Amino acid sequence: MNDLAVSFGGVDARLMARRAIFLPASRTLLVADVHWGKSAAFRAAAIPVPPGTTSDDLERLSKAILETGPARLVILGDLLHAKTWNTKRTHAAVSQWRQRHARLPIVLVRGNHDLRAGDPTPDLDIECVGQPFTLDGLKLCHQPCEHDN
């Protein structure tokens, strides 16, 4: 898996094969559309899907964190898939993952699924904000946001 170095808006970034973007100047790791609990939500709606997708996603995210050593993680929307995300199994996996990365500040820029699913539980210690989230002169959004001309 190869990463790609790019620059946009005067900001250097590393597009990672692990489905993340790393901004080295601010040591920020960006991800989007994590959809924790998606398989649990589908099973709750009687749609057959295998368990374990959240665990796979958490492991990939952990590897990106270990690889980059970020000062913060910013999730650009859709952290949670639906209100039914919070099964015992999913919450236990996410809680254990969060404990592994307890010192890492996490910011969630709410996306369309987050607005329906609600904010993550307080024990996960995730700061939730609306869009846009401004960082290094960039306006970060889940969906296209209005901008100044």
Regions found by a protein language model. Name each.
Residues 3-23, 131-149:
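Core dinuclear metal-dependent hydrolase active-site scaffold
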